[in-house]
Amino acid sequence: MALLLTTVIALTCLGGFASPSPVPRSTALKELIEELVNITQNQKAPLCNGSMVWSINLTAGVYCAALESLINVSGCSAIEKTQRMLNGFCPHKVSAGQFSSLRVRDTKIEVAQFVKDLLVHLKKLFREGRFN
């Protein structure tokens, strides 16, 4: 009986080692890039009905700034997965209406153009090995 109990406890403890670990940032970035590629390639109608978002400064804090812009687009299922993925990169909680200093305050662009610009920038970061 003691041997059985010891075996059960050992297997329970070792089970924690086999649990899934967080996805590496490089893999998460690659998946985000693939999602943006899918969005840009599968455009038959204007993305998000031609909704406009604030342009962002792509040189710093790109993930949170991109999420802050996209979070204000409602009723667009095409970018919901992208929003969730960006949320994983952003260390703080982003809510609709939040304003970042990283946005170019006077410039709004269509979501489709925003996604294309973001895709180009993220591909560049991936090539350079900058995953943060």
Curated annotation (Swiss-Prot):
One of its GO terms (molecular function) is cytokine activity. SUPFAM superfamilies: 4-helical cytokines (SSF47266). GO terms for biological process: immune response; inflammatory response; positive regulation of immunoglobulin production. It is found in: Secreted. Keywords: Cytokine, Disulfide bond, Glycoprotein, Secreted, Signal. Disulfide bonds join C48-C76, C64-C90. Residues 1-18 form the signal peptide. Its main location: secreted. It comes from the Eukaryota. InterPro entries: 4_helix_cytokine-like_core, IL-13, IL-4/IL-13, IL-4/IL-13_CS. One of its GO terms (cellular component) is extracellular space. Belongs to the IL-4/IL-13 family. Cytokine that plays important roles in allergic inflammation and immune response to parasite infection. Synergizes with IL2 in regulating interferon-gamma synthesis. Stimulates B-cell proliferation, and activation of eosinophils, basophils, and mast cells. Plays an important role in controlling IL33 activity by modulating the production of transmembrane and soluble forms of interleukin-1 receptor-like 1/IL1RL1. Interacts with IL13RA2. This is Interleukin-13.
